[in-house]
Amino acid sequence: MLIKFFVSAANNGYLNGLANEFNESTNSIRKELNNLSEAGYLLKSKKNNRIIYNANTAHPMFGILQKIVRQHLGLQEIVETVIERIGDVDQIALTGEYAKGIDSGNIEIIINGLKVNNDYLEKIKPKIKKKIGRDVSFLLNHKIDSNTIVLYTKTN
């Protein structure tokens, strides 16, 4: 559940939706949501007769928890590898299931830039998988929209 809320501050969820998503009972999800809310990690808001939960970005531990989640997923290693060896990268973003906070086993990364070495990307996929234990898909020069999480933006 931490992945859901801390991979991106924009992610949110409600009790029944989370129970379905995680294939767990509503009672176990409720207990976990209450524990995280009482500790201050999650905020609650009411919308259309539903209680919506999202990460408390003002919590002193938010940045640390987000960094831990991203390290757990192997995102930092992917970003560093891409920036160092792939070419002239302008932006790197997370998309797909992981951007929604769902640990599906396949990380989808958008890489936008000039002269990006696609052959090298294909070559390093097995190495990344071995290192982080997840499949990685690279999408070159795709649109970054509201469903993506920007991991890196080139500064001039």
Enumerate the language-model features and the residues they cover.
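Hydrophobic/anchoring residues in structured secondary elements
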Residues: 91-94
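Short hydrophobic/aromatic beta-strand micro-patches
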Residues: 110-112
